Amino acid sequence: MTTVQQVYEVMQRLAPPELAEHWDNPGLLVDCGGEVHRVLVTLDITPEVVAEAVAKQCTVIVAHHPVIFDPLKRLCPADVPYQLVQAGISAICMHTNLDAAEGGVNDVLADLFGIRQRTAFADGCGRVGDIDPITVPELAALAQRKLAALCNAPDTGAAVQVKFADTGKPVHRLAVIRGAGGSLFAEAIAEGADCLLTGEANHHHALDAKRLGLSLIAAGHYATEFPVTAAVASALRAALPELEVLVSTDNRDPYTYL
């Protein structure tokens, strides 16, 4: 018999809690106990994902984004933690510790782009290393193709939207930061990167990075993080072969792209 605690222990080995940022809230955030036969892996726990878990008879959801982040002052039926408890589904969430962990979110992203001799930077928030020379428009197009192939397709519009600020220099050294990493462009420059590929970057991040000689590619928060779900599922299957581990097909980018 596999327990919720056993699943949590595997996830703690994969993403050690001590790697989490001080402000974060990873862990076993909803514990309904009971036997576990089937697990659903996702980026976000949304009402749609809870319904998917119920339909697929999954009693544990393993997610990246914490389903409880700020202190709860009340619960109502529209709240996802309420829905989880009502359905008897436990939630294990590994956030910045999974970002920083070896084989975690950033390493999966680095693998996609063939980053060699990689090192961690920005306190584990990113990875940087060498790639075969490529132009920024070519790299952005490559990101579009690779990430779209690994994300759940939306009902309408493109699966992934990529935008870039190009200095005009070819990329030999690439930095990647999952999710909202645009503010860390200075750290990428300090590592000698020609380009930073991240999920989100604002207008001023792009202006400043380009002025300082760093190209910037923003490929979407969801798109740069969802690919880790397959890696987490594989790790769980290897550690607990008696479990059936599924990757969510209903966790999609909240944005629709034209």
Feature map (PLM): residue ranges:
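Hydrophobic structural segments
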Residues: 1-258
